[in-house]
């Protein structure tokens, strides 16, 4: 226990001692009190008695138990405004289905210490992880269809057209991975070891090109699913599934996003097998070829997914006047980043940074769909002026100061502006935190550098070396993905979906802008 916990612990301990004394002396007091005196209900006394920890519990354990029970007591005293949740103390906890995570050496009864070297054991573990991951993926895909798609269709919770949009080509992925699993199991020896996998992967990996349509549909699928969650029947069904053991406390989108997450893990899995494969092993060359194949497939799918995302948002832009239309928007194939920011009056704006133009919008609902109404004129990236406003710095006179109290410090602001002839505009935008602000600054700077380089070269290519990261965004192939796989999405009022940005400021400053084609990365 850390030092700061001691005062609270001692307070709880003294309270427990007081309860012990009160409980011990209560029988004697009852004989002396008048009969008309109000007595606490027995249920309340029992609840208080539950606060007393076991005598033999250690101090740390006693503190934990007391805290949990006191929380339970407070929640029980309130009216039941909401339906019980599986994490509530007053309802039996559901037995969440857990997945076995045994290692290869734990699964097969072999004397590995005498038969195989340490490096070979690690190689077998990596191959087994690949095979076990296929089993888990197949199980999850079948679960998504059986537990979500089919019941919602049968109960008419969603129409068949809506379900087809949300689930996409998920059905076609199941036999694809069943084929790889079958091949891996066929070459596994009776003792559980596998000698060669490289030739299998080289022959099977091209099948992953079928992921193209599934991944390209995910942006529209996620938007429709979020919209349908406003329907009470849909929300109730999904909540019941979430509380059921089979879901492992994962929502529907987690299951729908598993194929994409699996796709971007293949390069890592194959590199791990290659790392533990001897140089003179026949698999060495095949594994190197397989890695090149999967990297090319993922990069190509990522480009097409980015173009699909860009097109999706372009179709949902609403122009108040014809003068707001810009060919730079129509010709954009890449959406560098987008997200919610606030202006100096606290108004929420949704900002899109396309490859050559910055578009500031307001999110609105149009025909029961989330759309984005343009807020003033689009700003060409070539003419855009970016300014980093330091925390507490007032550069716009009273325009920012008036939006805050005298005691509140201005934080996480930056300004974008441009002037072209008689047209000029300036926007002071606030991110939700310093990290998010830095992401925006880096993304805009890199977009400007890319446009500048393209202007000198006379061409602007929309194809950069991106791969899908496990959190659904794009990262450059030069960036390691191990840390990306451990990151989780976070929601905030000023969130940002960064599709092609980098927070590596030092590298950005040290690199020649016109040689920086691989620099754009993603950090969510």
UniProtKB/Swiss-Prot annotation:
Residues 75-98 are annotated as: Disordered. InterPro entries: DBL_dom_sf (IPR035899), DH_dom (IPR000219), Endocytic_GEF_Adapter (IPR051480), GDS_CDC24_CS (IPR001331), PH-like_dom_sf (IPR011993), PH_domain (IPR001849), PH_RhoGEF3_XPLN (IPR044129), SOS1_NGEF_PH (IPR055251). The keyword Iron-sulfur does not apply. It comes from the Eukaryota. The keyword Cytoplasm applies. SUPFAM superfamilies: DBL homology domain (DH-domain), PH domain-like. Residues 290-448 form the PH domain. CDD domains: PH_RhoGEF3_XPLN, RhoGEF. Residues 121-303 form the DH domain. One of its GO terms (cellular component) is cytoplasm. It is found in: Cytoplasm. Keywords: Cytoplasm, Guanine-nucleotide releasing factor. One of its GO terms (biological process) is intracellular signal transduction. GO terms for molecular function: guanyl-nucleotide exchange factor activity. SMART domains: PH, RhoGEF. Acts as a guanine nucleotide exchange factor (GEF) for RhoA and RhoB GTPases. This is Rho guanine nucleotide exchange factor 3. The gene is Arhgef3.
């Amino acid at each position: 226990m850390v030092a700061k916990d001691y005062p609270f612990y001692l307070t709880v301990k003294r309270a427990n001692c007081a309860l012990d004394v009160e409980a011990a002396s209560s029988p004697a007091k009852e004989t002396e009190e008048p009969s008309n005196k109000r007595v606490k209900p027995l249920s309340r006394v029992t609840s208080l008695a539950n606060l007393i920890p076991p005598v033999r519990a250690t101090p740390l354990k006693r503190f934990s138990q007391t805290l949990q029970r006191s929380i339970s007591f407070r929640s029980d005293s309130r009216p039941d405004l909401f339906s019980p949740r599986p994490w509530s103390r007053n309802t039996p906890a559901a037995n969440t289905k857990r997945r076995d995570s045994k290692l290869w050496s734990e699964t097969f009864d072999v004397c590995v210490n005498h038969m195989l070297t340490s490096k070979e054991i690690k190689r077998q573990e990596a191959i087994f992880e690949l095979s076990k991951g296929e089993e888990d993926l197949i199980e999850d895909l079948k679960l998504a269809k059986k537990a979500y798609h089919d019941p919602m269709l049968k109960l008419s919770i969603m129409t068949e057209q809506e379900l087809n949009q949300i689930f996409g080509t998920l059905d076609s992925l199941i036999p694809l991975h069943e084929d790889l699993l079958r091949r891996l199991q066929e070459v596994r020896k009776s003792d559980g070891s596998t000698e060669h996998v490289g030739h299998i992967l080289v022959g099977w990996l091209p099948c992953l090109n079928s992921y193209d349509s599934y991944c390209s549909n995910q942006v529209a699928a996620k938007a429709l699913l979020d919209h349908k969650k406003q329907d009470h029947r849909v929300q109730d069904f999904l909540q019941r599934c979430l509380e059921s053991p089979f879901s492992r406390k994962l929502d529907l989108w987690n299951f729908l996003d598993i194929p994409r997450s699996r796709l971007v893990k293949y390069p890592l899995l194959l590199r791990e097998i290659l790392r533990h494969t001897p140089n003179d092993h026949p698999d060495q060359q095949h594994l190197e070829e397989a890695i090149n194949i999967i990297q090319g497939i993922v990069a190509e799918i990522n480009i097409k997914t980015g173009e699909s995302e860009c097109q999706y948002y372009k179709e949902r832009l609403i122009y108040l006047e014809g003068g707001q239309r810009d060919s730079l928007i129509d010709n954009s194939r890449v959406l560098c980043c987008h997200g919610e920011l606030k202006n100096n009056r606290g108004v929420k704006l949704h900002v899109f940074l396309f490859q050559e133009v910055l578009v500031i919008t307001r999110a609105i609902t149009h025909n029961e769909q989330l759309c984005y109404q343009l807020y003033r004129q689009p700003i060409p990236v070539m003419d855009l002026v970016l300014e980093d406003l330091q925390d507490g710095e007032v550069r716009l006179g009273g325009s920012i100061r008036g939006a805050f109290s005298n005691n509140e410090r201005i934080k996480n602001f930056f300004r974008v502006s441009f002037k072209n002839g008689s047209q000029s505009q300036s926007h002071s935008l606030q991110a939700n935190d310093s990290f998010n602000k830095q992401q925006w600054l880096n993304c805009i700077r890199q977009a400007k550098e890319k446009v500048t380089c393209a202007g000198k070269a006379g061409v602007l290519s929309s194809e950069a070396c991106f791969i899908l990261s496990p959190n659904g965004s794009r990262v450059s192939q030069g960036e390691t993905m191990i840390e990306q796989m451990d990151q989780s999405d976070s929601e905030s009022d000023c969130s940002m979906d960064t599709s092609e940005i980098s927070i590596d400021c030092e590298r950005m400053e040290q690199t020649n802008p016109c040689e920086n084609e691989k620099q754009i990365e993603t950090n969510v």
